Amino acid sequence: MIIKPIASPARYFLRTPSWSAVAIFQAVKIKPLQLRTNSSNSVTPNLISPSKKSWKDLFSKRWQYYAEISRAGSPTGTYLLYSPCTWSILMAAYAYDSSLVNVTKMLALFGVGSFLMRSAGCVINDLWDRELDAKVERSKSRPLASGKLSVRQAISLLSVQLTASLGILLQLNPYTIKLGVASLVPVCIYPAMKRITYYPQVVLGLTFGYGAVMGWPALAGEACMNWSVVAPLYLSTISWIVLYDTIYAHQDKRDDVKANIYSTALRFGDNTKPVLCGLAALQIATLATAGIMNGQGPVFYTLGVAGAAYRLSSMIYKVDLDDPKDCFRWFKRNSNTGYLVAAAIALDWLAKSFIYDS
């Protein structure tokens, strides 16, 4: 007997009454292929694309938690910590006509140091606040608050970060090293301040603005330390930090009340915007004073001082303090204000070298 081959298995099943197309799909759990049109109006299969992997997926869960507690994926804090350092270094370069090589070296060292110390500060903050963070919606998923990392693991990470930071600090002159060691005091006590005072942002300002004190002597040396420039510059950075961190604190004001956490956002309340205007005026006035004492040129005032004044006034006018997302959006934009002032000082330095002194 000669057996004829079946032309098509699918055609055979479809000719069989018990194997309709619907039955086949149901039997093997296959969904009909969906079609979609692309921008050229041609029909293409809507195939399932593989899920996209982020850079975090390259590391184990523990390393992902280490990166999370260090805020490695949120660089805004590093930029804000770095900005006062750049202002001070570049102002010293303007005053003493420093070489580009030395300025670049200092900017690089302070850049790495800012990343390390900001990361270490976040770990210290989370160690202090792990119980409070669990009560706040925005922070309850942090590694320590959620139990993803243990206290011992966080302390081990902190030890590595502080050791690396010390390695950066030891590249500087002895006077700047002493200043750097002194900065650890506000770094360590800041998390406790939100438990006892409505003004923890002031302590944060002393901490985050400290680069304005260290940058100048790091480049110029102890003998050339000019407090008539550095002091108003430091006050300018403190005012700026209190301003933008008050906006940041408005994100959590409802949860903070429940958790007994204090902040300038709660202290100022409905009067926050008038206070922010006062802080902005103080920042701009002291920034201009530092420029006057340093003999800065017109580029600094037109781009740096006036530019910062415009950005701050625009932010204060537009930010919705009752919208957490809007508060965070405007908070992040302060890093651009820091870049603007740094660029103004750098361009003023170049103008002095090639235009003012020519």
From Swiss-Prot:
GO terms for molecular function: 4-hydroxybenzoate polyprenyltransferase activity. GO terms for cellular component: mitochondrial inner membrane; mitochondrion. Pathway: Cofactor biosynthesis; ubiquinone biosynthesis. Its main location: mitochondrion. Pfam families: UbiA. GO terms for biological process: isoprenoid biosynthetic process; ubiquinone biosynthetic process. It is an enzyme of class 2 (transferase). Its cofactor is Mg(2+). It comes from the Eukaryota. It is found in: Mitochondrion; Mitochondrion inner membrane. It is a multi-pass membrane protein. Its EC number is 2.5.1.39. NCBIfam families: ubiA_proteo. Belongs to the UbiA prenyltransferase family. This is 4-hydroxybenzoate polyprenyltransferase, mitochondrial. The lineage of its organism: Eukaryota, Fungi, Dikarya, Ascomycota, Taphrinomycotina. The gene is ppt1.
